[in-house]
């Protein structure tokens, strides 16, 4: 029963955030710069974290996000559980991102991010995407979402994966 509810509720969450993000992306118009950032293990060191409001940031990645926000619109994409929305929003504001200065998009899986990236890429926007697209951090052997990475690389966007920004996670 729990799996059925999660599947039904998760589909609603995905549909809501994808629809809302698509409207905001399309309202930007062509030739605008748009920057997508994952949160977990991209701008925040969530490995082993028990409380998301206490998660340590990667300061140089936070600086990069703030720099990119001067150039265009910032969207945070996350595959966190929707129940963490308030604590995630609180964490972002605490790190210096004012409410209204960014969009926060929750999705049930990393693969769902492709729909949003595709919308931006096919509407003439200048898109840059930062995401480690990895999992299993807590078990010591990091694994990549290879299929998702390949799909992202097939889009007309600039993708920055873990190997591109690991040096900023000091």
Predicted segments with their positions:
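Non-catalytic pre-domain segments flanking phosphatase-related domains
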Residues: 1-37
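Metal-dependent phosphoesterase signature
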Residues: 27, 31-59
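Anion (oxyanion) recognition and catalysis
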Residues: 29, 66-70, 121, 153
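Short coil/turn segments at beta-strand junctions that form active-site/ligand-binding loops
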Residues: 31-33, 72-73, 123-127
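Short acidic, S/G/P-rich loop/turn micro-motifs used as interaction or catalytic elements
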Residues: 42-45, 49-50, 81-83, 134-137
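Short, acidic loop-to-helix structural element flanking the phosphoryl-transfer center
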Residues: 49-75, 85-89, 110, 115-118
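Structural beta-sheet core signal
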Residues: 76-78, 129
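C-terminal cap/substrate-recognition subdomain and adjoining C-terminal extension
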Residues: 85-170
């Amino acid at each position: 029963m729990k799996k059925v509810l999660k599947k039904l509720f998760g589909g609603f969450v995905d549909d809501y955030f994808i629809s809302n993000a698509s409207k905001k992306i399309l309202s930007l118009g062509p030739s605008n710069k748009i920057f997508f950032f994952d949160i977990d293990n991209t701008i925040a060191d969530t490995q082993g974290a028990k409380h998301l409001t206490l998660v340590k940031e990667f300061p140089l990645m936070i600086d990069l996000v703030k720099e990119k926000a001067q150039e265009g619109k910032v969207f945070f994409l996350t595959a966190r559980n929707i129940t963490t929305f308030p604590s995630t929003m609180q964490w972002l504001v605490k790190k210096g991102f004012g409410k209204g200065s960014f969009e926060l998009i929750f999705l049930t899986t990393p693969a769902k991010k492709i729909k949003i990236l595709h919308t931006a890429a096919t509407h003439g926007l200048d898109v840059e995407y930062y995401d480690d697209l990895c999992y299993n951090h807590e078990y010591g052997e990091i694994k990549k979402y290879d299929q998702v990475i390949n799909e992202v690389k097939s889009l007309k966007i600039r993708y920055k994966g873990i190997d591109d920004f690991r040096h900023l996670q000091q």
